[in-house]
């Protein structure tokens, strides 16, 4: 059974065709510059690249070319579109309505439209991608898998902001959390590596990429997470500020005469480690600059590591202990130095790291020592596989 997994951005589209029986990705692809000059599709099959360069005025045209690439006689992996049993779509925001993945119908599409106000940057391209697929593949079942769904198990005292209650009731202002599919995947893999039931474990998962969030998992459920109403909250990130005093925004508007759009650009695109370092939002560049003596680059890393360490400490209190800590995503999987710095200062938890094992990059591995009281894992995330699994579960009766 083959499942197409689609992740639509505003001008890009990532996809994978997964054989769900073997859980193997048969093809992976990226479409860039949709609706912009220089549109390009790059597909990889067994390490071989296949490139299509032609104008793509919209996502429908992009999906057409994806399907064309998948069935291409020379470079494709299927002989006919009918081999695609179902399509799984990554959707950033499901609001309070969806605590799990769902089969897409007209009612679901309306609910996704209603969530646009909660995710104005992300949900519209997700919806456009779904509509394009439904138009081109009308008989193929489609499933929406939400970034927010895993966190719908947060208790009310964890998701409620101390604001007038009407803002929650009337406008849906509360903590939602994101990266849920990733947190769900790596926590389940950690339990497999420990040969224990996830329901018996307390796990802290650290999704550390350009966007970053932590999640506290208890009895297999998310009970706390660092992102909030939007993906801006929580940790310092590549270009996002994370948690700051909200009055700073008022100061920027009133005293610095910045418009709301200008403030938005600063806190979303010019802050985080980029803002502090003045070097880059890429941690590899910042680590390089810090090694060469750039003090602001070192400070940016120190702030970042501190916010992650601080949050891990808080989540051990939320969970009343911790059995495992998991690192995933770009930085979490590949930066031994960052993992070491983050865990440095958490020795009171009984954490001991094997320095040699910690040098591994991008591999699934336990990096704690045998006598460490808390297990520490590096687990490459696989959100696409999780989306494919959910899609199979919902469409195969």
Swiss-Prot record:
GO terms for cellular component: cytoplasm. Mg(2+) binds at residues 7, 383. It is found in: Cytoplasm. ATP binds at residues 14, 207-211, 282-284, 330-334. Its EC number is 2.7.2.1. It catalyses: acetate + ATP = acetyl phosphate + ADP. Keywords: ATP-binding, Cytoplasm, Kinase, Magnesium, Metal-binding, Nucleotide-binding, Transferase. GO terms for biological process: acetate metabolic process; acetyl-CoA biosynthetic process. PANTHER family: ACETATE KINASE, ACETATE KINASE-RELATED. Homodimer. Catalyzes the formation of acetyl phosphate from acetate and ATP. Can also catalyze the reverse reaction. This is Acetate kinase. It comes from Clostridium botulinum (strain Okra / Type B1). The gene is ackA.
